[in-house]
Amino acid sequence: MMPGSRLDTSVWRLSAAQALAGANTTVVYATGAIIGNVLAPRPAFATVPISVFVIGMASATLPVGALARHHGRHAAFLFGNLCGLIAGLVAALALFISSFWLFCLAMLFGGAYAAVVLTFRFAATECVSEDSRHRALSAVLAGGVAAGVFGPQLVTATMNLWSPHAYMVTYIAASGAAVLSAVVLLGVKFEHRPPVARSGGGRPMATILRQPRFIVAMLCGVVSYTMMNFMMTSAPLAMEFCGISRTDSNYGIELHVIAMYAPSFVTGRLISRFGALNVTLAGLVLIGFAAIVGIGGMTVGHFWGALVLLGAGWNFGFLGASAQVLACHSADEGPRVQAINDFVVFGAMVIGSFISGGLLSALGWSIVSGLILPPLLLAAVGVMWMKWSRQGSIVRALE
């Protein structure tokens, strides 16, 4: 087998694993708030399971980065898939005995699994040459298109298979998907992996974190992901409050997740052609349109339209921000910087997840939608400042 073929195979294995593992996140977001509303001791706690899921993502990010740095990506992948298996089985048990807090514990493991899955995008860049990094990153996230179909359809097909315990079979099936993902990942080869850095190698972390372009990249990642999560967490519960069927709600999440990942087939090329800043800005604008549609009404069409725009905006915003992060560090600094970036992103998401359920109950869907606009404006100002600063630097260099 030729080297190029092996590299392509590794990228597509990561993409297939993304499709299988992505079902974990899709199932959680499609069902977490609904299950929480049934099991929680009070309505304001309905979105706590999803908040705990995000806490799992945030708390696992730095340890996963350290595990990958010291023992290799495959060790991190194995840890993630083990967490996915545990999450599905514990969630099924929680539903069987109707335990809200045990379900929250399952979500903690599910979040840790999701944190590992998000490293697939950076892992793909170690399977290809430098000039193919953006395409590899996009190819892996494109596997989420399959997850966008697989996850919600899995929920719809299994949610009532054991009617006394809705969604129990769903989580058992999700644990099976984690096992299949582990098998697929066994064949991934990191042919362009940088040498392991010595302790203290690379620039001091403070130097990297002080870079204006890194600050803007992290801000855009935080806003894109947190605002998407804030709105998506509330959407299934808001649809239930509006009398929309769970089948239509699942389909809305399916459209959303497809919209999150389908643009990945071209996002890498768009970044190469127009630059990461422009693609990020386009994503922020699309998320803004999602908020406007959400404010505009609470019909099925409004929910679906807002979720599609929200997904596409996340893709451009988050992938553009990820590409900016890649430009802020050397190869041996990568795992540390990427782990810190993801830790900050997920940490911000925790806050959004915790407050979304209470805000939805107290203020309604329209207000929840409108609240995402100010952070989007702040991130857009940061992007425009970077664009103007870069243009000014070019002009000064030519003088």
Model feature map: region roles:
Residues R135-Q153, V344-G352:
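Glycine-rich segments within core transmembrane alpha-helices of 12-TM secondary carriers
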Residues V155-T156, S175-P195, G382-K387:
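C-terminal membrane-cytosol helix-exit motif in multi-pass small-molecule transporters
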Residues A106-G143:
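Cytoplasmic helix-loop-helix junction between adjacent transmembrane helices
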